[in-house]
Amino acid sequence: MLRRATLLLLVLSSAPLGAHQQKAALTTVRYNPRSDEVEIAHRFALHDAEHAAPEVTGGDAILRSDTARQWAFARYVHEAFRLTDERGAALPKDLVGVEVDGSLLWIYETLPAEAGPRIARIRHEALLALWPSQENWVNVVDAEGVRTLILRREAPEQALANAPSRPLPQ
């Protein structure tokens, strides 16, 4: 009986844990008519963000409970995510919030409404230097539909015009 219990314990302790690095982030860019702003919502797996925290926030942290480190990570993402116009000029974004929701870390930014139509290129470098397989997916939602860019270490920036538009679900 003890042998079986020991064997069972060994098998269970060697099983992969549910928490693992997703190596992907999702950002949604869309106009909100109520606020008359373009809202940017970045979604990171909390587990991934906590693994990256020592590198990007300057210290170990349990982001779930450390508000200062959440904001440090948010500032890192704010700097790593850039929107530019057709001339290459950066469009002005404001970092407005960060929150933990279950197993996700959300970071919120806004852009003045008049700048939204001028978005020509998107660059998203968050976590790309840390993990070669990291992908940053960016969905841009507008009246024509959804355009998706998949940004990777070898191509962290793309022209929005290169992304085909898919209609919004009815």
Regions found by a protein language model. Name each.
Residues 10-18:
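Hydrophobic h-region of N-terminal signal peptides that target proteins for export
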Residues 19-170:
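N-terminal soluble domains immediately following signal/targeting peptides that reside
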Residues 1-7:
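Bacterial N-terminal signal peptides that target proteins for export
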Residues 8-9, 35:
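Intrinsically disordered, low-complexity segments enriched in polar/charged small residues
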